[in-house]
Amino acid sequence: MMVGCENSKKSDSGSNEDKSLSDDIINLDQGDPTAFQEYWMKKKDRCTVVIPAWDLMSYFSDTKNVCWFLEPELEKAIKALHGAIGNAATEERYIVVGTGSSQLCQAALFALSSLSEVKPVSIVAAVPYYSTYVEEASYLQSTLYKWEGDARTFDKKGPYIELVTSPNNPDGIMREPVVNRREGGKVIHDLAYYWPHYTPITRRQDHDLMLFTFSKITGHAGSRIGWALVKDIEVAKKMVHYLTINSIGVSKESQTRATTILNELTKTCRTQSESFFEYGYEKMKSRWERLREVVESGDAFTLPNYPQDFCNFFGKTLSTSPAFAWLGYKEERDLGSLLKEKKVLTRGGDRCGCNKRYVRVSMLSRDDDFDVSLQRLATIKDLKCVEP
């Protein structure tokens, strides 16, 4: 089977031809969002940031703000972008900036659990869940909270916090809370992928605590910027306290870069020829079509099917093209180990609370890595091709 290649410039990881003939390992375990690099190369004159040596020297940005290290211009840019896309309410909310959404998730766990009268607070998420949640809830062995696993089977009495990722990482499904009681429960809505290049924007999310990350919108993971939209001032204050102890704020250089790029997104989002979201949607759609072509050409793998829905941002019915593929194997076998033999690294389903015959595959790699991963996947035509 021939697997087509997307048009792309040679990246710093080498050419498509060289890599396909080599023994290079393709790492699709990490969600390193380098897929959009080509778009930003064309924006170098409009998105380059120059910072004088004397600027941004203070710890403080706005001492009157609950989040005193949040740059005022970044706050404006965040509100403007959410307003333009229509994916989240920002009115009557406090914006807390963090070093990526992972730090903010930990800050939110601290804030919500420390405000609880009963401790430790149970932390749950529905299977398959984002694997890092387990690490974030368990690493410090905190007395404030404790990881309790699958939200669907959770029946423990007492306070709890449910982590809801929508669209879900790893399977791309839109999610709502599943714990069958509300007494003593709090919810953290992780909306990192609720953007129109991944999924139709069907409504404006309006929750008490919502997390977003710069990296998964634009691909600028190296800037380490995320933000939380928080309704309760006491929760916001607790989160800021955690961030103050943890890192004494967030890099102003990163905030300045994020401000420039978010403003560019807002400015061009309705211009089809320049819109990042148009570009991102077409790229993700193409990648998913090519992956499905490979999967459907054989009898070894499975992928989730996603319903089409009307996107309020694009004004038309669209398909879903998640940032990760939840790839399944039709027999009970460790799919991660099988793909590793093909020199493709993925995240095993057991890390997401599921069976090892599932893996999470990043759809956000550079073009050449994605192309070669499809070529290697295509060599596994059916179950008979694989030695037991």
UniProtKB/Swiss-Prot annotation:
One of its GO terms (biological process) is cotyledon development. It is an enzyme of class 2 (transferase). Keywords: Aminotransferase, Auxin biosynthesis, Cytoplasm, Pyridoxal phosphate, Transferase. Inhibited by L-kynurenine. One of its GO terms (cellular component) is cytoplasm. Pyridoxal 5'-phosphate binds at Y59, S101, S102, N169, D190, L191, A192, Y193, T213, F214, S215, K216, R224. The keyword tRNA-binding does not apply. Belongs to the alliinase family. Probably involved in auxin production. TAA1, TAR1 and TAR2 are required for proper embryo patterning. This is Tryptophan aminotransferase-related protein 1. The lineage of its organism: Eukaryota, Viridiplantae, Streptophyta, Embryophyta, Tracheophyta. The gene is TAR1.
